[in-house]
Amino acid sequence: MGFFIQHGLTKPEILYPFLFGIFAVASLCIATLLFPASFSAASRVISWVLSIYLEVKNPIRHTETGRNIPGPSYVWPNGQGDIEKYVQGRSRSEQWQRKYGNVYRIWAGMTPEVVLTRPEQLHAIFKDSDKHTKATNSDSGYFMSRILGQCLGLMAGPRWKLLKGIAAPPFMHPTAVRSIGRIQEHVRAHFHDLETNGNLREGRIHPVQDLKMLPFFIVAEANYGSLTPAMKSELDSLAPARENLMKFVLFGGLARFNISRFFPTEANRQLRRFRSQWRAFNRAAYERAREKHPSAMVVQMYDAVHKGVLTEEQVAQTMDETLYANLDVTTGGLSWNLVFLAANPACQARLHEEISALTPAEEEGYISRNGTYLAACVLESSRLRPALPFTIPQSAPTERVVDGYRIPAGTNYVVDTWGLNVRDEFWAPDNSTYRPERFLNSSNTDLRYHFWRFGFGPRQCIGRYTADVVIRAILLHLVKHYELQMLEEGDFTQDPECWITHPDLQVKCVRRT
């Protein structure tokens, strides 16, 4: 009330119309979220007003010309997130860079994000990535906060270091290498099941639908120890529900705002159901693992909760991150390999020749090595089909200058992975061609800041070593025992509803004789 008293606004004839005006504007905004088709004209007016306000509130100017940083205007309610940024990201990446240049600004909700497209921009930003702060809820709004807002990947500072110390050991390089034999057992069992009960009986394989749960259950064992059939069944049954929740995040609208929690929406009903089931599963898994697998990650996590070091919400969301969130990422990293090998028989033949020369005893060492043709194939696939069109936003602790634009401390950055991995002249002249050989003579120093896969600088994805050995083990088995061929000619079909780049097609997969 101090503001109203100071400015003489406490008289009813002034205060009531003022409050009514605020209520009317708020009601109109909510109406555009609940009934967007009926209030499209109002949405355009709100977009125009907020775009002007946000430009004034978040100035980023060129140090010499004073010109404001270019970029698309804010659009109510989502800005350019998350549909344009992720689902339509491949096409937007090219359009935006062509229209706005090599550095520009987009809006994730009402939060500005500076887009980087060039290798030379990245060193100045990511040299201290361990000191960066991940964007609150990944700039995806309230609904995201209820799924992954407190997970390890979105933490920073002491909390991140503490939780990383608990979550990272099962996924570090020595542990990943020691697990290769166990991973190969999972792979053999999975393909036996596909041949007995799946599409493989008919000589076909869907790179996503037929393989996505294989790496999922391998990681689940690292989290919980050995899994009972009932645990596998419950994890499997939760996957579609969790996948559907991400669609509410992607499409935004009302779910982006805190006020959405007061509405009886289908999104909130599904969220409550999933959170209850997920928490119950993890509690039961903890009690079982305490007896049978005391070193399992779930035991270390819940022990930290009981000591008051972590909250159960942080544990539940981090376990979700390692499984369901990374299910999409690992599936994307694996599945495109099948498509590219099927579409490039000469590369597949070379890989088969290299694998065929191995004895069974040599396979584990081969899977763990980085300089192989298999490793090169995995890298080339991830170059041409980066998991995310734009990276998860994060901010640097100090002011930076990028291409002459002075970026204030705390501003979020994202990297255009298509601009970096594919369109950059570093990969010329055959930027869009699948040619794994390009990685055989490339060192990590050569590739630094030219190639995005697991992040940049000191802070990278903790699951990168496990992801590599899992993908390589699956591809080794696949190419050793089967020949892949394309069933259809033309451009590769992509799942239009997935925020991660996934193929949506079947590949011919015939057992070798």
Swiss-Prot record:
Q: Which residues are glycosylated?
A: 258, 370, 431, 441
User: Does Cytoplasm show up as a keyword for this record?
Assistant: no
Q: Which cofactor does it need?
A: heme
Which pathway does this chain act in?
A: Secondary metabolite biosynthesis
Q: Which UniProt keywords apply?
A: Glycoprotein, Heme, Iron, Membrane, Metal-binding, Monooxygenase, Oxidoreductase, Transmembrane, Transmembrane helix
Q: Which CDD domains match?
A: CYP_GliC-like
Q: How does it sit in the membrane?
A: Single-pass membrane protein
User: Where is it predominantly found?
Assistant: membrane
Q: Which GO terms describe its molecular function?
A: heme binding; iron ion binding; monooxygenase activity; oxidoreductase activity, acting on paired donors, with incorporation or reduction of molecular oxygen
Give me the Gene Ontology terms describing cellular component.
membrane
Q: Which InterPro entries does the UniProt record give? A: Cyt_P450, Cyt_P450_CS, Cyt_P450_E_grp-I, Cyt_P450_sf
Give the domain of life: Eukaryota
Instruction: Name the residues that bind heme.
Output: 461
Per its UniProt record, what Gene3D superfamilies does this chain match? Cytochrome P450 (1.10.630.10)
Subcellular localization is given as: Membrane
User: What are the transmembrane regions?
Assistant: 14-34
Q: What is its EC number?
A: 1.-.-.-
* Regulation: induction: Expressed during the earliest stages of maize kernel infection.
**Effect of gene disruption?**
Blocks the production of aspergillic acid or ferriaspergillin, but accumulates the intermediate deoxyaspergillic acid.
Sorted alphabetically, which Pfam families does this protein's record hold? p450
Signal peptide positions are none
The record's comment on protein family reads: Belongs to the cytochrome P450 family.
The record's function comment reads: Cytochrome P450 monooxygenase; part of the gene cluster that mediates the biosynthesis of aspergillic acid, a hydroxamic acid-containing pyrazinone with aliphatic side chains that originates from leucine (Leu) and isoleucine (Ile). Aspergillic acid has antibiotic properties and was shown to be lethal to mice.
Name of this protein? Cytochrome P450 monooxygenase asaD
Q: Which organism is it from?
A: Aspergillus flavus (strain ATCC 200026 / FGSC A1120 / IAM 13836 / NRRL 3357 / JCM 12722 / SRRC 167)
